[in-house]
Structures are given as structure tokens and as C-alpha cells.
Amino acid sequence: MIQFLLAAPRSGSGKTTMTCALLMALKRRGCAPCAFKNGPDYIDPMYHRAVLGVESRNLDLFFSAPETVRTLYAKGAAGHGAAVCEGAMGFYDGLGGVSDRASAWHLADTLGLPVLLVVEPKGQSLTLAAELKGLDSFRTPSHIAGILLNNCTARMHALLAPMLEEETGLPVLGFLPKLPEAVIGSRHLGLYTAAEVENLQQKLALLADAVEEHIDWPRLLALCEKEPPVLPVQPETPPARVRIAVAQDEAFCFTYAETLEAFRDAGAEVVFFSPLRDTALPENIGGLYLPGGYPELHAKELSENTSLLREIKQKIESGLPTAAECGGFLYLGQSLTDAEGQSWPMAGVLPGEAKDAGRLVRFGYAALSADSDSMLFRAGESFPIHEFHHWDSTANGVALAAKKPVGGAEWRCGFIDEHFYAGFPHLYWAGTPLPQRFAAAAENYRRDHD
């Protein structure tokens, strides 16, 4: 089985572009590839999914123990001929930027994957060899198996490749030229989502054509051939006992594939709906999940869907088990200011008006602790979370305690009760008791309302 992790010395080196190009090329070759993303990012897996037509999973060693990550990887890779992981940030950049925990290197080390390092030879030549030698020797083993040059000309590749191989001992496996017609734009939370990019499939085809031509495929495939991961025996997915409505559209698109799998494994049927277009919730539901996304970019349309807002407010106030993260939390507030500064009424379930803070707010990983029992949490428990948002609310809640793993910054956040969780923190549900608790609350609600 072909298996590797793509990493880079720093963010902005072209990991996502290179990952998509290689995935498309592997797909064309009949390798039936699957994809994974190191870390908590929601957007890069959307591009993987756009290339492959199958879900991409997140693998995060802050969220999950190594054995859980290995199981998630093996589960996702089962039935595929190639597995490609995309790293995050710089190769060794982990918690707080001062640890290698949860870094791309940590994931490669945990899974035993060869690493292909994506580098841009911009303003460097021999110094690039020194940088690569440093990366290769910084941890033992580094797992670096080869180099891919990004935004590189054929002439530059011909000049650099022999020198880099001689100086570092690492094979240079090829290059991706600069393709202005295949550029993907970005905004305040990273790249545009895959659904928003015009002519995405044509751009992906151009990228795949380029790597087909400029990469030494026999060499790459030989370096990355490994035994398939062993999947532990998994319990059968139980028959669905309750329906959970999951918001999914352009405004609410930050959902992990593993979360939905965990809901199903807990006995729930996942039923999607669009807060932008549907005027009512799905019928006979026992729970409601409102994930994050970009509600601030669609505030007018969300606000004008008054029938759905009224129903959501009424159902939550009647006890419908609900979990709302980040953008979903903002949707339940009093009002949401859009990117142009216009304020729009929202569901009004919670206090608080949300506005653009003009910067990332409480960005990064944290541990979320409960002081009392509720639908999802038990007193004294702690769960890993992350926050990633520019908008902030005048009422973020105080029910839970959050603490960063590096630096120790602390704050209160969230609203909880026996049927409710809402707050800025994104939860990572897989491998925790949270899906079972949510599904149990949903079953109890349906039993009481049938």
C-alpha cells in the first residue's frame, strides 16, 4: 500500500496544493487513494473530498491518544490502495509552537509514515540544503524520505536537485511548477472552502497533469510502499434508534467525518438540513447538532429564514438535545454582525450579540473542564477542544473552564444544561463518551415526545 505524509518547513509552502495534485494523480493511476489531515483544520479535508469523492479524516494527537489515532487511520485506510496525510504548519510545530506534540512529525512518528517534504526554493539555493539537513537531523528518526519542490521551474529543478541530493542525501522526487491558473484564494480562516472555488475540478486537473509530468513516480512509489495498517476488530454499527439533525451547508460546514461516524456508532441516524434553505427541521428528530462554519458570511439569509429560526428556538426551549459549536453558537444568539458591519437577528435562544473582533480570538488548543453534570459533561471531566474564530460575542457563557496547554491562559465559556451545549469551543467527539451521551439524551427526548 502507498502511504506517506506531506509536510513542509513552514505554513504557506503549498502543502494543500501538492496534496491535491498527488491525490488526483494517484486516483488517475487507479490507486483508490484516501486522505487525512493532521490537526484540527476543517477546510483542507474539503479539498481532499473534492478530489476523491470520499471523506477525509482528521488525525490529531492533542485530541486523541496514539492508539486512537492509529485506529482512526487504519479505519480510514481500509479498502484503499493509497493513504495520504497532509501535515499542518511547519514539520515540527506542535502545541503552542514550542513542542513537537501533535505536530506533523509526531503524526508521522506515531504511524510510522515516510515524509515527503514540500519546499519552495525561493531566494535560496545552497542554504536550502542546510535547512533540509537541519530538519532531517532535528529528531531521530525524522522519517523524511524525499523532497518535492513547489513553485519551481524546470531549469531551477535541474540546477538544485543534484546539489540537494549530494548535500543532504535525500532524494528530490520532482517539482510542481507555478500555475497561476490553478491558484486557490484565501480569507480570514484560511483557504476558501472547496465548494466556493470556481472551476475547481479544472484546477485540480491542471495540478495533476503537472505532477504527472514533473515527478519521478517510480521512485516516489517505491519509497512510500508499506504494509497496510492493521485495523483492530470493530464492533458492528448498531441499528439507528434515534435521528439527529445536523446543519450542513455553506454557512455550517465545519464538521469532522469522524464525528458523524461516532454519532452513527452511538445508534443515531444522521439527517442533514440546511439553515440557509430549509424552512423546517427534519421530522421526528431527537437531537440537533449545529457545527461551526461561516454564518457571518450568510447572516442575512440565515436571519431571513424566520420560520426555521422560530422552530429551532421553540424546540430547544422544549428540551430538544442540542450541541452548538462556534458558528452554531453564534446562530443561537440574539444577533450576528456580517462582514459588512450589518447586524442581523438570529434565533435568540441565548443572550449575546456577535461582531468581528478584527483578529483571531482565543486561538488554538485548550482543555475544557466541567464543574457540574450536564447533557455532555460530568463534573471533573476534561476534554480537548480548539477555537478558531475572528467573531466574538458579548455573552460567551461561563459554565465551563478552558485552559491552554502551553502558557496556561484560562477563561470561562459555554452554556450547558441537561439537554444543551453551546459555546465557541469545537469539540472532538470521536473516541470520547460524548456521542453516546448525546444519543442517549436524544432517545430520551423522542421517548417523551412520541
Label the model's feature ranges:
Residues 108, 238-239, 252-265, 269-271, ...:
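C-terminal and late-domain segments of enzyme folds
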Residues 240-317:
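Phosphate-binding active sites in nucleotide-utilizing proteins
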